[in-house]
């Protein structure tokens, strides 16, 4: 009873704090002068991390196993990983470009786990025989950590696409206005050459320089986080194959979860391949990573929605009249 009460308190404290962090974070986006608000949001995420850590430890103690055996527990674990990713730049004293991604991700993931799922899914259950293995911690923790990192990296790539395409649309719009004003051809050519010279100078406008810096940082952090996520995903798939051989006598069975995990791994393998090609990196790799964002959610929720296959433990229970 004490553990259940403590879990309930920690769940609602962490969700309340991260809700306040979201409000503070958007205020700092609107008003950059409030440095104190930024520090408060970071401390709030730190509080959320400790609450989620306490929640996982509490659930681990009274359930007797690492709380990653069903959808509710994996969502809480996913929120915990998001909070860790959020704090890495903060402790390294870097500008936290990830906060726009990780704070809302923590909020929506934990919100769905706390309020969106059925109440009976919050109750810890005895592990089914197939999950009573030492491979549970290795396989599931690596997979969920990989999902979290890949989701964050994919969202950074999507943000890069939005900023880049907004710039392209603005430039195209300006060029169309020039043509509609019926400038002489030589004057248009002169203006385009002048624009090209200004573009290549070492003294760009502060607005363009900030945009360029932001794109570079999004690309840098996106690549690093996706690299970590891809490594975790690979380890998770390999450890799962070994576990499957012990449990079912086969390394691979092509059930829905395994199939979509392979598709996810392939998509991000293509992403890293595009990064090695100078002609394909940048926008092309960002597009691939953005597609990967959708694939991850299909892989993560697909089996739980269908409730079929060897990985259907802890799936949604469909109630029919």
From Swiss-Prot:
Residues spanning the membrane: 17-37, 48-68, 71-91, 98-118, 143-163, 225-245, 259-273, 286-306
Query: Which Pfam families does the record associate with it?
Result: Cytochrom_C_asm
Q: Does the keyword Thylakoid apply?
A: yes
A cellular component term from Gene Ontology for this protein is: chloroplast thylakoid membrane
Molecular function terms from GO? heme binding
Task: Report the InterPro entries cross-referenced here.
Answer: Cyt_c_assembly, Cyt_c_biogenesis_CcsA, Cyt_c_biogenesis_CcsA/CcmC
* Keyword Membrane in annotation: yes
Give the UniProt subcellular location, in the record's own words: Plastid, Chloroplast thylakoid membrane
From the UniProt record, give one GO term of the biological process aspect.
cytochrome complex assembly
Write out the entry's keywords from A to Z.
Chloroplast, Cytochrome c-type biogenesis, Membrane, Plastid, Thylakoid, Transmembrane, Transmembrane helix
Membrane topology recorded in Swiss-Prot or TrEMBL = Multi-pass membrane protein
Question: Chief location of this protein?
Answer: plastid
User: Record's superkingdom?
Assistant: Eukaryota
> What job does the chain carry out?
Required during biogenesis of c-type cytochromes (cytochrome c6 and cytochrome f) at the step of heme attachment.
Subunit structure, interactors included:
May interact with Ccs1.
**What family is it from?**
Belongs to the CcmF/CycK/Ccl1/NrfE/CcsA family.
Q: What is this protein called?
A: Cytochrome c biogenesis protein CcsA
What is the protein's species of origin?
Answer: Populus trichocarpa
């Amino acid at each position: 009873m004490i553990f259940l009460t403590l879990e309930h308190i920690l769940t609602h404290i962490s969700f309340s704090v991260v809700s306040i962090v979201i409000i503070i974070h958007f205020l700092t986006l609107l008003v950059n002068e409030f440095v104190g608000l930024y520090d408060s949001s970071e401390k709030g995420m730190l509080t959320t991390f400790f609450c989620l850590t306490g929640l996982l430890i509490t659930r681990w103690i009274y359930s007797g196993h690492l709380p990653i055996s069903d959808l509710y527990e994996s969502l809480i674990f996913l929120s915990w990983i998001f909070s860790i990713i959020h704090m890495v730049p903060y402790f390294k004293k870097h500008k936290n470009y990830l906060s726009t991604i990780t704070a809302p991700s923590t909020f929506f993931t934990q919100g769905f786990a706390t309020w969106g799922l059925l109440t009976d899914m919050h109750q810890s259950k005895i592990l089914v025989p197939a999950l009573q293995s030492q491979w549970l911690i290795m396989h599931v923790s690596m997979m969920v950590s990989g999902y979290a990192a890949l989701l964050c990296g994919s969202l950074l790539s999507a943000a890069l696409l939005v900023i880049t395409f907004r710039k392209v649309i603005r430039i195209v719009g300006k060029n169309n206005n020039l043509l509609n004003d019926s400038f002489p051809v030589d004057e248009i050519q002169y203006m385009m050459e002048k624009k090209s010279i200004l573009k290549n100078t070492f003294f760009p406008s502060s607005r363009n320089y900030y945009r360029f810096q932001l794109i570079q940082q999004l690309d840098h952090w996106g690549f690093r986080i996706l690299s970590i996520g891809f490594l975790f995903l690979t380890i998770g798939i390999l450890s799962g194959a070994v576990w499957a051989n012990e449990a079912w006598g086969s390394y691979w069975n092509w059930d829905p979860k395994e199939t979509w995990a392979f598709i996810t791994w392939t998509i991000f393998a293509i992403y890293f391949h595009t990064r090695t090609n100078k002609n394909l990196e940048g926008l092309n790799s960002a597009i691939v990573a953005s597609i990967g964002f959708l694939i991850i959610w299909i892989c993560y929720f697909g089996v739980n929605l269908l409730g079929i296959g060897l990985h259907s433990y802890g799936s949604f229970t469909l109630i029919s009249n």
